[in-house]
Amino acid sequence: MKTLFALLFLFTFSLVSAGDRTIRGTEELRAALRELKPGTTLRLAPGDYDGGHHVRGIANLTITALDPEDPPHFKGGANAWHFSRCEGLTLSHLRISGQSGNGLNLDDGGELDSLVGGITLENLEISEIGPQGNNDGIKCSGLENLTIRSCRITAWGGQGIDFVGCHRALITGCRFEGREGFSASAGIQLKGGTSEVMVEKCHFLNAGERPLNIGGSTGLAYFRPPGATFEAAGIVVRENIIEGSLCAAAFVGVDGVEFSGNTILFPEKWIFRILQETTESGFVPCRNVRVARNRIVFRRLQLRTDLNIGGNTAPETFVFAGNQWFAEDRPEASQPQLPVVEKDGIYGRDPR
C-alpha cells in the first residue's frame, strides 16, 4: 500500500512540475518555445538572450527569471517578445534593450471584438528602444484585466507604454525616464477606445513631450471596441510624480478623467493640454476631466501659457478643485488662467 501511495505521489508531482522548465541560453529557449503548452513556466537563467521571439495562443504562460537578482537580458531584434492572444500571461524580472521596433508587443491577434485578458507584467527593465520613431517600450492592443507593476522604462522612441483599445487595467509603481537622442513622444498613452484604466504611484522624468497622453489619435480601424466615440474614458491618474517635459499631461479626445493627488514639477511650455485630434463624425469633444488636489510647481519664465486649449474641445466641462499652484520664480503670479473658476485653489505657497 505504501508503495502504491508513493507511486501515486510521484505521478502527481510529475504532472504538476512537467510545465516548469529551467532555460539556459537562446537555443534552449527557442527549443522550449516550439514545444509550449498552456500553463508552462519558463525560468530563465542569467545571461544574454537574443530578442525576436513570437508566441501565439498559449494560455497561462509564465516567463520569469531563475534568479530575480540577476535577470536574463534580451538584446536586439525588432521586438524582444511578441505575444498574440496569450490569455493569463505573466512576465516578470526580465531585462529588455536595443530593439528596433517595440520592446514588448502584446495584442489580440487582430480580433478587435475579442479582448485578451489576465496579463501581468512586473519588475521589467526596458531601455533603448528605437531610438527615433513610433517605437514603444510596451505596446498593448486589445487587452483587458491587465496589470503592469514596478517596471522601469528608459529611453524609447514613441511611448513608454502604449494602450490601444485596452480596458480595466492598472499601471502602478513604474518609472519612465527619457534620454537625449530618443524621440519619446509620451511616457504613457491611452487611446483607441481605452477605458477604465488607473495610473498610480509612477514617476515620470523628462518622459517625452507628453508624459501622460490621455487619449490621442487612432485610425478608426484600430478602435477596440469598434465604433467607440472617444479615445479614452473612465481614466484615473493619481499620486504620480511628473518632472520636466513640455507639459505634465495632455487630455486628448477623452470622456471622463480623474487627475488627482499628483506632483508636477517644472513643465517647460504648458502645464496641461486640452486637445481634440480625432474629429470624425460622432466623436465626443474632449470633456469631463476633474483636476483636483495636485501640487504644481512651475516657473513663469518657462511657460508659454498655463493651459494649451485646442479647437473642438469642451473645456467648460473641466473641474479644477483644491490644487496648489506655485510659480517658483514669481510666487505672486502663481494663480493660473483656467477655462473655469477653480474651487478652493491655493496659490503662491510652495507645496513641496
Sequence positions of predicted segments:
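Short acidic active-site motifs
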Residues: 28-32
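Beta-strand repeat architectures
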Residues: 33-40
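Bulky hydrophobic/aromatic "packing anchor" residues in well-ordered structure
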Residues: 23, 63, 346-352
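Glycine- and acidic/polar-rich repeat regions and solenoidal domains
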Residues: 54, 75-83, 97-118, 126-146, ...
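Right-handed parallel beta-helix/beta-spiral solenoid domain characteristic of secreted/periplasmic
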Residues: 20-27, 43-46, 50-52, 56-104, ...
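Extracellular beta-strand repeat scaffolds in secreted/surface proteins
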Residues: 40-44, 323-326
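Bacterial Sec-dependent signal peptides at the C-terminal "C-region" and cleavage site
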Residues: 11-22
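Sec-dependent N-terminal signal peptides
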Residues: 3-13
